[in-house]
Amino acid sequence: MGLIWLLLLSLLEPSWPTTGPGTRLRRDAGGRGGVYEHLGGAPRRRKLYCATKYHLQLHPSGRVNGSLENSAYSILEITAVEVGVVAIKGLFSGRYLAMNKRGRLYASDHYNAECEFVERIHELGYNTYASRLYRTGSSGPGAQRQPGAQRPWYVSVNGKGRPRRGFKTRRTQKSSLFLPRVLGHKDHEMVRLLQSSQPRAPGEGSQPRQRRQKKQSPGDHGKMETLSTRATPSTQLHTGGLAVA
């Protein structure tokens, strides 16, 4: 009888943990690809490197494009708005990545609903960023946007560094795949210079140095006047034309 009970327990054992991991997978992955459920708090400073070899950058003028070089406008702050939904802000431009109702990417000077993107993990290890507000049906690019539409509009940069319109994008295209890169040494230097230049008040720190240089200049007429007023004739020692108290 003891052997029979052991066999029954061994058959029931594998079924116990299946409910836990199964629910975990369904909670972490919504539809295709995974969702960053753990994000929140402080923003992540990253560079979004597209599979087309361009870094996504946001300009102060509101333009969005890709850059092959090390640009300060490609340093971004990715902040979690909700579970799987992020807002992308340019650190140096101060603008938010946004997509309008025509599927065009632009850099907005203020945060709005067009600045929210659904961040998902692609099977190849890249990330995709789809507009949370706009999407289209499966009937074609010219279809009207519907609340129950299925195909999202993705952030995309083509092989020439130009953004593609949302209704022309697919999640499997190289132009829609981005790899969040950690900032390098040069990027950290630019961020440090930006942070150190912001809190400084205008006109402070540089004037005292200039005043010291003016006082230390030899042969200055103003210096001779100050020395003559401070020193008395009885305590002056003349060496080489300079008065020392």
UniProtKB/Swiss-Prot annotation:
Biased composition (Basic residues): 161-173
Induction: By integration of mouse mammary tumor virus.
This protein's UniProt keywords: Developmental protein, Differentiation, Endoplasmic reticulum, Glycoprotein, Golgi apparatus, Growth factor, Mitogen, Nucleus, Proto-oncogene, Signal
InterPro entries: Fibroblast_GF_fam, IL1/FGF
Post-translational modifications: Glycosylated.
Single GO biological process annotation from the record: positive regulation of cell division
GO annotations of cellular component type: cytoplasm; endoplasmic reticulum; Golgi apparatus; nucleus
Polar residues composition bias: residue spans: 226-238
Chain positions carrying an annotated carbohydrate: 65
Pfam family, one: FGF
UniProt-annotated stretches for the region Disordered: 137-181, 195-245
Extent of the signal sequence: 1-17
Gene Ontology MF term list: growth factor activity
SUPFAM superfamilies according to UniProt: Cytokine
Cited PANTHER family: FIBROBLAST GROWTH FACTOR (PTHR11486)
Family under the similarity heading: Belongs to the heparin-binding growth factors family.
Quaternary assembly: Interacts with FGFR1 and FGFR2. Affinity between fibroblast growth factors (FGFs) and their receptors is increased by heparan sulfate glycosaminoglycans that function as coreceptors.
Function: Plays an important role in the regulation of embryonic development, cell proliferation, and cell differentiation. Required for normal ear development.
Protein's name in the database: Fibroblast growth factor 3
